[in-house]
Every structure is written in structure tokens, then in C-alpha cells.
Amino acid sequence: MKIGKLNSIVIALFFKLLVACSIGLVERTNAALESSSKDLKNKILKIKKEATGKGVLFEAFTGLKTGSKVTSGGLALREAKVQAIVETGKFLKIIEEEALKLKETGNSGQFLAMFDLMLEVVESLEDVGIIGLKARVLEESKNNPINTAERLLAAKAQIENQLKVVKEKQNIENGGEKKNNKSKKKK
């Protein structure tokens, strides 16, 4: 009888310890991700400030036009966009790592919180002229709520794919020479 009671106490204590460790891990993960998100947003603001110093007039951006056709400092603007994309990629990698850690034990609230951090970061990209990304990601999430690691990773992949397209448009690899692929020949 005493051994059964002792076993019950040991099991209860073990369970409480396991829950406490799990909660501590989740809190540390959230704090680390929030800190990383804040750092990235600060880096994006720094990138914008540096580009402004190189002659980019971000105030010239219109609702849909955020390229060198509406502002000065074309190469500096394209470099700023690429720098912001590279830094965002690092943050998205951290999100992926944490999502995979929580894949089995995480709950929908945790994945949604991580998604919200991704949206905040994507929104901060608008400061350097990368617009419309948040709206596209939100539209997709309406059909597939972000409540699992798989859906969070799918949203992350969508962001990465769209950022890849923006990065390729900047054409930095070719010495900054911007080519216009549209043919203006008329027959």
C-alpha cells in the first residue's frame, strides 16, 4: 500500500517537473523569437537609413510603385531590398527550427504566435519598398489557418518564394545593371 502511494507521488512529481520544463521551454522560445523579430525590424530600419544616406527617397513611393522609377538612388534601393531579404531569410530559418522543435508538442496558439511574428517582420519590409507580401500571406492563411507546424512552414515557404522573386527582380548579381525585359518594339 505504501509503495503504491509512493509511486503515485513520484509519478505526480515527475509529471509536474515535465510540465514545468515544457512551459519554460515555450517561454524561452517565445522570448527568443520576439527578440529576433525585434532585432530584424531594427536592422531593416538601419538598412533604410543607410539607403536614405545614399540618396534613396522612400517618401516618393506610391501605393503600388516602390522601385527606382519613382525614386532616386536605384542601385542603393535595390541593394537595400536585397539586404532586407537576406536578413529576413535568417529570421525565417529560426522560425523553421523552432517550429520543427515544437512540431509534436506545440499547440495551435504557439504556431499562430510564430505566424504573427512572421507577419510583423513581413510588414516591416514595406519600409524598404517590399509591399503586398503581408496581404498575400494573410489571404492564403484564410483558407488554411496556421494551427500546425506544417501550415506554419508552408506559410514560411510562401514568404520565401515571394521574397526570392523580389530579390531576382533587383538584378544585383549583374553588377547592378537593371534590364528591362519588356520589348518595346512595335510592328
Curated annotation (Swiss-Prot):
It holds the Pfam family Decorin_bind. Keywords: Plasmid, Signal. Coiled coil: none annotated. Residues 1-20 form the signal peptide. Belongs to the decorin-binding protein family. NCBIfam families: DbpB (NF033720). Binds to decorin which may mediate the adherence of B.burgdorferi to collagen fibers in skin and other tissues. This is Decorin-binding protein B. The gene is dbpB.
